[in-house]
Structures are given as structure tokens and as C-alpha cells.
């Protein structure tokens, strides 16, 4: 699917359809560039959909003295909430104090800094709590008493990527998924890029290129014959999803005796998301999965805190992603910096190649703005500065505290939808839900129901407006309905896709 007309040469080719690549493509298009976005798989099919689903400052990074990164991340937290209040929500996190681990003075100091260095405005401040009286204490073992409650944000990470791509396409970006870059080389003052897709091999040309391929950044540089002294550290983060362990909206920040931390987060109404691990990854990137050891580790960690025990057999879904971190020589993978580096190759008549090293979801927008600023001397059509801080993503054009009102409006206008379906739709599409719900006055107007309120109208929207091509794209990235649909329902969806595509 392409939303831009063909021409002989693009101003900018962005290689990589994760959050950084889509963010850069959107920003550059909004400043006047003609952009091509190339992704070898589905949007967000790599690291960007395998996060802990948080928009956060990174409380644990204070321990590693990454004050600048935490400050930047905290500042971005409320900016992102404001431009995408349907897929980003404030969340309160409960941090129990655990005897023998980090002392209370250290936790208080860290939380004080967390509250004050990032320009917090709308989110509530940290509070000291007594877990013997606090609602979040009910699910925990009785030995936990003192604790703290602080603010951060939750995000639907894959939809964040898709919405950046959608907005980019609306601004003229040519988005091509399932398109592999097999060769790229400088030729006649521009980049000559050879791609392979179901359409066969094609050659495109661009005045500048961005390498936003995440864990494959060094591989692409090698193919472009542009060596770098930069070293990457690939760190695997694994997560598990289990049936709901608690009946409230708080999340948990837990410490472990090995010094690591992990989260337990309310997830998709009926589940709890637990993660993450930090393990150096030396395998391939095509099929990254949580190991049995990591799954057991997360279960054991949860069992140190929750009154109800879980085992690997309770895990209904697990996933893992490889984080492409800048190798700063840290002894332990969890201590490696989550900051990013932008490396520009080009000048003196040579077309620019900008490579992205590292980064985290929370800083993607700021990274994109900085990347486009670096490209301005090479692309004179780029006009203006950072514009994305106040430009809503598709569906996010409503007040940042207005999700409940938006949901109520959908429930009123589409009374035939189940309340759980209305809630899911509001949190996925925001104001854009009405684009595909349209004037429907009954369920049959939305076509087939594949299960749990997932209708033909919604599936068609994913295909025509969100680049979905497979059931996995729909059920595990555009939504998380894969947690609910059974095999027969998935088969029915796949038959529908075969007929349509």
C-alpha cells in the first residue's frame, strides 16, 4: 500500500519500520521532505512491539547516573500522553520496600528526583504508603508494609508505531512493508537502493537515507560498505502474560536479590504482564523468544511478592525482543545505557546516511526531531523545527484526560457494542474509531464477527489504513485479540484475509 505518488527520486529513504524509523519519517514529511519508508516485515514486528509497554522516565536508570536520559524521558512522558491519549495512559506504580535490598533513603531520594527533574505537570506526585492498608497490598504477601506509589505511563507500543506510520502516510510518505533492502550504494550524488518484495526487485533513489533498523543497524552499514567504530550490545528482554493476579489498576515495581527489577502490570483487562529480563543475546533476530529459564525466572520473581503463586504452566503468552543498546562497557546487561547515538556519514557532495544506535520508546519523538535536524544541511527542502510535540497522532485529537468521555460517546452512539468492545476500540483508535464504525446502527452493519467484537469492518480498516496483511499483524500488533480468539476463530479470519488479499 502506498499513499504517495511515484517520482524519480525521494528526498529521504528511511529503512526500518519500528518506532524510530516511523517517527523520523513522520517528522521529515511534516517539514516538507518526500519520504520513502521501507520495512522488511510488518510495522513494529521487531523490538518496538516487544517492550514492557511503558512510557516512563526509567527510575532504575538513576541508579546508573543516567540523569540526562531520565530528564529527557520524563519530559517526553507527558508530551506523548498529550498527543496520543487513547493509546497512552497514566498509571500509578507501587514499589514495596524490601528488607535487605535498596534502603529506604535511596528509594526516597530516587523518587524525589523522579518527581522533580522532568517538569512533571499533570501526573500526581509520589506518596509513601502502607501496604497493609493500601488496595495494592491485598494481592501481596503479608510481610510487605512500607512502600511508595509513583506515576508513569502505559503505552500500546505497536499501535504507537502504526499511528506514526499512518500520520506519516497522510503527510505523503510512501510506506512499504514486507520490503527488504538487499543493496544500497552511493551513485551519482544519491543513494541507489535495491529492494525485494512480492512485486519482485525494484530500484529506488534517495538524496539521503536513515538506517533505523534497530538490532540490524551494523548489518545494514556493512551492506552499504560504511564501516563504523561503534559497537552494539544486543540485550534480550523477555516478558510473560498470566491470568490476572490482582483486581485493581495499580502496577508494581519489584526488586530482586540479584539487584534487578521487574514490573507487574494490569494488561488487557483480564491479564497481568510481568517483565522484563536482561540477557545478552547472541542468537539470530528472526525468531526471538523467551527461554524456559527466563520464564521460570519471572515466575519465581513474582512468587517472591504475590500471595498467589504462578508457574510456567500458567503463562498464556510470552514474548521477547532484542534491544539494540550502545555498548558502553557495562559489566551487566541491565546497566548498559538506554540512551541513543546518531551517527551521520556523508558531506562534501556525498549523500548522507544517518544511523540510529540505541534508544527507547519514550524518547522516540525527541530522537526523530534530532535526527531530522541533523539532516537539514543535507536536505534543503526541510523547513522549520520540532513540530511533533504538539501534533496529535491519528485518533488523539481530544483532551489528554478525555478518554472516559470519548468512550462514553462511543457507547451512546453504538449501543449494540459490548462494553468491553467499546473500551477496547476507544483505547485503540480514539476519535478514528468512527472512521470505520461509520453510521452503523446494528452489529450486522459491521459485517462478520470473528470473535470478541472483532468485526469485518475493523479488520478491513486494519488492511486498508494500517498495512495489516496477516492474522498475526491484526491479533498481536494492531490489537492483542490473539489472547482471546480460539483456533477456529483465527482460521475464519485467515480465510477472510485470503479472499480479500
Task: Locate the predicted segments by residue.
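C-terminal catalytic lobe of FAD-dependent flavoproteins
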Residues: 151, 157-159, 167, 227-238, ...
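Beta1/beta-strand and adjacent pyrophosphate-binding region of the FAD-binding site
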Residues: 6-20
